[in-house]
Amino acid sequence: MPKFDRAELEQAFRTYWRTGAVGEDWDAWADLFTEDCRYFEHFYGRMRGREAVRAWIKPVMEKHGEIYTAYEWHVIDEDRGRVVFYMQNRRDHPSGQGTLDFPGVSILEYAGDGRWKSEEDYWAVKQREVAMREYEEACRRHDPDHPRKRTRWNWGDGPEWSRGGRSWAERPAVR
């Protein structure tokens, strides 16, 4: 017998995605975790508790506000209450042509009632380093102010619920 209903897991994941990746409301996103959650971020380390996650995510996303997340796919494991998803950490190229991406995979474990009890994030470190370097060089060549513009020109080919507007200012209110 499944631990959680598939429809509940799907709805919780869509809310998680729309709140964080699309809406970029990091306070509301942190509230989707249990008070005692576990979070392992491959680069930044381990965190314990919702407030630790909030204290980490807000300054990171402010510092790297030009990055957005393009959905590729997700799978649901009803028996274990898990959602695994694959995405691209994306920056629009300052020339207006193309994107600079590095892929990531995350594993969410559901606690019920719309909350997550754990998350593990993994991404391609070498590809991240290349994308960061290429973006910095492209900004110097094409548009030094590009990071402040927070463009979101290419959300990819995911379903409608996984995409937002063309700039950070156009992000939808999710609450």
Region locations from a protein language model:
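A structural signal for well-ordered alpha-helical scaffolds and beta->alpha junctions
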Residues: 10-13, 50-53, 101
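Short acidic-aromatic low-complexity motifs
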Residues: 2-35, 170
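A general structural-boundary detector
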Residues: 15-16, 40-43, 94-95
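A solvent-exposed, acidic/Ser-Thr-rich amphipathic alpha-helical stretch
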Residues: 6, 26-83
